Amino acid sequence: MSIAGTIDAPLDLFGGLVNDMPASDLPQGVSPDCQDVAFLQGAVKTRPGLLSVYTPIAGNPTVNYLKTYTQPDLVNTLLAIDSAGTLWGENSPGVLTQIAAGLTPKAAASSTSLFSREYIAQHDGNFGLDIPRQYDGTYLDRVSQIGPGAGPAAVGDVIANISAISRTSNVVTVTTAAPTGMLPTDQVIIAGVTDTSYNGTFPIASIIDSLHFTYAQTNSNSSSGGGTAAPVGSISAGVHQCAVIFVTRQGYLTRPSPPISWTAGGGMRANVTGIPSVATLPNVVARILAFTGAGGDLFYYTTGMDGAPQMQIFDNTASSFVVDFSDTALLAGIEADSLFQLVELGECAGVIGYSDRLFWWGERNKQNNWDNLTFDGGFGGSGNNVPLGWTPDATFFAGGSFDATGEAVWGGDYAILGDGVIATRGLMTQTALADYNGATRMQANTGYSARVRVRMTGALTQGTLHVHIYSSSLGISTTGVTVTPSQISAAWTEFIAPITPALGFLALPSDLLLRVYADGTPTAGAGFLVDNIEIFPTTQPYNTSLVRASFADDPESYDGVSGFMSVSENDGQTVRSAFLLRERLYFVKDRSLHVTEDDGVNEPASWTINQVSNAVGTPSVAGVDVGEDWAVIAGRAGMYLFDGGEPIKISQEIQPLWNTINWAAGQTLWVRVDTLNKRILCGVPTGTATSPNLILVLDYRSLSSSGEIESLGSILFSTLSGKLYAVGRSRKWCPWNITANSCTLAERSDGTAQIFLGNGPVGGAGNGKIYQLSDTQFSDDGAAINSYYTTYFFLSNDLEQTYQIRSHRKLFAYLTVYAEGAGNLNLSAFADNEAFPTALTTLPLSSPAPKDLELPINLLGERVAFQLGTNSPGAWFKLERFVPSLLPDPWAPVRGGN
């Protein structure tokens, strides 16, 4: 075929998608329609395919969280959480190993690395769903937890009655009725013996056993009885207080127990008995006894170092402990009073590390001054079956106990077992009015609700669990949370219900109680397991603008007074995400951006917070990511780039596509910056999808700075000519048809970082797979990649003038294509409008391409766009040059009518 008389109109600039203006008006070098392609310098190609990295997870769950965690030994471990609530880790390359099961199912997650641990927040996209957790490569523990639900049973001077006392050869042997805990280096006070010659203060000569000791005294041989023996001590006379603190294996000191007091006689030691047990708390490695000086109200403890008294108990089985201290030694110890202000961190949506602190947001609101609602504060009473801080009912507590199955959400949980005979089981209460300090729990005219996690144990078929408010004097017995066996299973389920009338009670009786019990004669040998009770004002279920901040270098301690920040409170928005940029901490709300920084003096509650933007925000925890000293924010109006100044929109060219995002599910979108390949990936739910079913990809490969990304859009405007034009160095957008619930840059054993994607639901179901984007994979796990690129409509007005062709019908006679790949290159032409495609002959691809591909087409049209692509498993293309040969229609350049 001859192409004599035709004009070549080469296209070697392949820009990104632009659909915010009519396709017929686009300048040369951009695309009105493309998908599943990636951009190279001077070329466009099929995007990387999906390579399944691991054996699919059983049950085909979706994978809702991915993150690389660097362990203390510097080994990189990919962490993954699936929709079944299982945490996985890649401990050996290519193999996932289960770390923990039983996390909240169907939850997403975010995390941050700090202090060689990974801190994880599980959420529903809006607020927290599960307790905050930390993973150190060995243990998956809760972040912060309550302290003991009650203090020790008693504290008293160490003094024992003497059962027998005798003197032989100037050595006195003493038998006591109870242990005194004395050491061979101690002195003992003997008083009240019938034979007064024995009385006095003497150095111990030897300890025979816990009930027998000797001391030297020159006198005649004799024996006697009565009296007391007390080791000489240093405790000052007067009223002292004692509280108990749990110490975890992560080094966290909990909030102290409610304190108890005793009056010391002076000059003796003290025996602390009934110390809260930690048998149900696997992460507690020690207990600390904190004391006040005589008549004081500030608590201190000492650690036994440098000759100081020992107040740490490392034997977790011990229920009693003898202490000896002077007020001088005590007050020179470690101050513990501030620990009473600690609050247990609630379920949060996100977490970030900054200035050696952790910051958490999206917390579910709860009251923090009830006793042992999570049952992590220990058990006591008969058989250690009563949760500390609760009062067992004298008649109906039978059947209540700690759960011995080890199935707690975390730490301990409360079990109510039936016997098939007695109707009411496991009844226990605590006051609903105020805590031991007098701080209010419930207020009049305020409605309250409760969250409770429940599961069954055994073959439970009858009975009803109740968590409600009760008063005998006023006849109050609210419905509260009620759970029947048909509502639960062997997995934890959370129930939320009001426990008071909507407007609360007009007056609060003195006997107002929170009650937990089961009635309806629960099945013998089966019952209810109860955990994580949370009480909150019904109208304030979430802390929308509050950010919890830990102490510096103390990531589990959250002060209820100074350890939080209020970010533009009461503005109708919620803190959704956070990021770091140039030593500053930014908080992103739904439609605003705020910044703070460590002032080096105060706790976070006193830091200054400034608003950066009152328009740019994100609906998603994962809606922000950081690139090379800049951040990107995905919001309802578009994608914005922020480099410390004013956020600049960088997605205007695809606004119609952005508008297809289902913002009712906007909390599920995610953003990830691939700094190696210079791409920004944004997974979004479009149409009616409720999770990300499309990835919007911005290629900035040819751009070297944030300023260029902001300013060099797909189409530029010439102030000289007043016309639009495209350039090679520009933003290039393209949608990728990939369904993925999560994305991360995974650190690999070869030293590279690769984009990993957690599968999302396709057809309503997941497949249990984690994918890697791979340039050597030419299918999506065996499925064809339908990749194509559509050119602009040839010719632009400028080129018509340049080639002197005029703006009438043209004959497109021939195509020359420089492309390589595999499979067949599919070609279509759109004459005058995208709505009217014409299929062209396919062309075989090879790599490398030995020559240009040529095709006669003889196509008429005022303007024509061409689409090239592949759509078979293993097929791919790379297009570097596209040349149509054309001339004015030699027969009828105009129709002469319509």
Question: Could you tell me what each predicted segment is?
Answer:
Residues 1-97, 103-117, 239, 249, ...:
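Beta-sheet repeat architectures centered on beta-propellers
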Residues 2-7, 14, 57-60, 89, ...:
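Disordered, low-complexity "stalk" and linker segments at domain junctions of extracellular
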Residues 50-62, 101-105, 142-155, 235-237, ...:
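Beta-propeller and closely related beta-pinwheel folds
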Residues 180-208, 249-256, 290-303, 472-475:
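Ser/Thr/Gly-rich low-complexity blocks that favor extended beta-strand/coil architectures
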Residues 375, 379, 425-464, 495-503, ...:
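Extra-cytoplasmic beta-strand recognition segments
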Residues 381-417:
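Extracellular glycan-recognition surfaces and repeat-rich motifs
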Residues 474-508, 840-858:
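Extracellular carbohydrate recognition and processing domains
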Residues 496-533, 860-873:
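Extracellular beta-strand ligand-recognition surfaces/modules
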